[in-house]
Amino acid sequence: MQVYADNAATTAMSRTAIDAMLPYLDNIYGNPSSLHSVGQRAKEALDAARETVAQCLGCEPREIIFTSGGSEADNQAIISAARNGEKKGKKHII
């Protein structure tokens, strides 16, 4: 039996997640910032996902930021905390 203990770095996707993502990997893969039809379909899908996540979290869709991975998400959280702290006169993050 194989034991995989590095789930903090990479975790296998569940079959449910793979099945949910297949339409986007196969057909809706465009750059959502593009003006062409493939990009616009991707933008529509991204906007719908943002709306769904916002409803689940009880916030506005404009407050949802999707990132490409853990490091980018960590950096975004630190930058947001620093900016919010700065507004309150706090100059350090510990």
List each language-model region with its residue ranges.
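Pyridoxal 5′-phosphate
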Residues: 1-94
